[in-house]
Curated annotation (Swiss-Prot):
InterPro entries: HDAC_PDAC (IPR050284), His_deacetylse (IPR000286), His_deacetylse_1 (IPR003084), His_deacetylse_dom (IPR023801), His_deacetylse_dom_sf (IPR037138), Ureohydrolase_dom_sf (IPR023696). It is found in: Nucleus; Chromosome; Cytoplasm. This is Histone deacetylase 8. Binds 1 divalent metal cation per subunit. Changing residue 101 to N: Almost complete loss of catalytical activity. The active site is at residue 143. Phosphorylated by PKA on serine 39. Phosphorylation reduces deacetylase activity observed preferentially on histones H3 and H4. Histone deacetylase that catalyzes the deacetylation of lysine residues on the N-terminal part of the core histones (H2A, H2B, H3 and H4). Histone deacetylation gives a tag for epigenetic repression and plays an important role in transcriptional regulation, cell cycle progression and developmental events. Histone deacetylases act via the formation of large multiprotein complexes. Also involved in the deacetylation of cohesin complex protein SMC3 regulating release of cohesin complexes from chromatin. May play a role in smooth muscle cell contractility. Residues 14-324 are annotated as: Histone deacetylase. Its activity is inhibited by trichostatin A (TSA), suberoylanilide hydroxamic acid (SAHA), 3-(1-methyl-4-phenylacetyl-1H-2-pyrrolyl)-N-hydroxy-2-propenamide (APHA), 4-dimethylamino-N-(6-hydroxycarbamoyethyl)benzamide-N-hydroxy-7-(4-dimethylaminobenzoyl)aminoheptanamide (MS-344), 5-(4-methyl-benzoylamino)-biphenyl-3,4'-dicarboxylic acid 3-dimethylamide 4'-hydroxyamide (CRA-A) and butyrate. The gene is HDAC8. A divalent metal cation binds at residues 178, 180, 267. It comes from Homo sapiens (Human).
Length: 377
């Protein structure tokens, strides 16, 4: 998408919004599972001078009322309580999903409110017509349920962002390209036809969260408004893009969305400790370009991504895609430069693992989805 060559006043609204403040990044850096990841991502975007081509907007912190548009008061109050005390052994915590993969560490409520607020801020920028694309790379925590934490996610900022967008946009399409099924977002909207959720993810026995088979299609009025594309290990860019484009083409025609929320978790990328898909940022970038050409209000979120350098590579490359910029292969010198060794390049090379996706099974899945979308009115 080239930048508009229009007078500054009308063109300015087409410059993407980038949610950022030093305080926000340092808050996001504190999550134990991804230490300093937010700083690495922002520093690389800055090293390529991409921040200068976007409108930087400082995020607001979500209020209790804003968080309660989705989460229950009881859950939020408990999260606030254990966060103040740093109490990881509270007897009620298990019931709220706190513990093992979502430890109740000190300050976790402030972290959740910061992320939720940042995604709401991005959504509000789209509502206000400030931009067509708003980016919050530290958002995308798609597993949290209304009354429990799950899978490193304490607050479902994606749901909060969608609910905010619903104030203006009648039909919202949520697309989730993280390695894991976007179960929290799907569950939140499984009974409504106003939000369609589409998730491409790894689906195999014992793999978290264990949901998202092609037969999971939503419930009640929301039946056929949940689309799940189960994928096996080893998939690479070309096949992934073919699947993504094929599904999104049908979805767009059937649902006619007015706005898009796009979760771009980088745990699909080769080199991730999840060791499942075999993608590169180029493949995800093609999917992103396909969505951007609809020219709808689009909220961009991050998500998983546990190889920190590769996640920064991926989201910096995707920021370049949003801006229509080709980035130099050589990583510019910056604070985290040494993390990009031994080659110090932006590109990521797929590994030589086999692709476990059989063409006939993929075709079956695509046919099944196409059949379901005939019911969408």
């Amino acid at each position: 998408m080239e930048e508009p060559e229009e007078p500054a006043d009308s063109g300015q609204s087409l410059v993407p919004v980038y949610i950022y403040s030093p305080e926000y990044v340092s808050m996001c850096d504190s999550l134990a599972k991804i230490p300093k990841r937010a700083s690495m991502v922002h520093s690389l975007i800055e090293a390529y001078a991409l921040h200068k081509q976007m409108r930087i907007v400082k995020p607001k912190v979500a209020s209790m009322e804003e968080m309660a548009t989705f989460h229950t008061d009881a859950y939020l109050q408990h999260l606030q309580k254990v966060s103040q005390e740093g109490d990881d052994d509270h007897p009620d915590s298990i019931e709220y999903g706190l513990g093992y993969d979502c430890p109740a560490t000190e300050g976790i409520f402030d972290y959740a409110a910061a992320i939720g607020g940042a995604t709401i801020t991005a959504a509000q920028c789209l509502i206000d017509g400030m931009c067509k694309v708003a980016i919050n790379w530290s958002g995308g925590w798609h597993h949290a349920k209304k009354d429990e934490a799950s899978g490193f996610c304490y607050l479902n900022d994606a749901v909060l962002g969608i609910l905010r967008l619903r104030r203006k946009f009648e039909r919202i399409l949520y697309v989730d390209l993280d390695l894991h099924h976007g179960d929290g977002v799907e569950d939140a909207f499984s009974f409504t036809s106003k939000v369609m959720t589409v998730s491409l993810h790894k689906f195999s026995p014992g793999f978290f969260p264990g949901t998202g088979d092609v037969s999971d299609v939503g419930l009640g009025k929301g039946r056929y408004y949940s689309v799940n594309v189960p994928i096996q290990d080893g998939i690479q860019d070309e096949k992934y893009y073919q699947i993504c484009e094929s599904v999104l083409k049908e979805v767009y025609q059937a649902f006619n969305p007015k706005a898009v929320v796009l979760q771009l978790g980088a745990d699909t990328i080769a080199g991730d400790p999840m060791c499942s898909f075999n993608m590169t940022p180029v493949g995800i970038g093609k999917c992103l370009k396909y969505i951007l050409q609809w020219q709808l209000a689009t909220l961009i979120l991050g998500g998983g991504g546990y190889n920190l350098a590769n996640t920064a590579r991926c989201w910096t490359y995707l920021t370049g895609v949003i801006l229509g910029k080709t980035l130099s292969s050589e990583i510019p010198d910056h604070e985290f430069f040494t993390a990009y060794g031994p080659d110090y390049v932006l590109e990521i090379t797929p590994s030589c693992r086999p692709d476990r996706n059989e063409p006939h099974r993929i075709q079956q899945i695509l046919n099944y989805i196409k059949g379901n979308l005939k019911h969408v009115v």
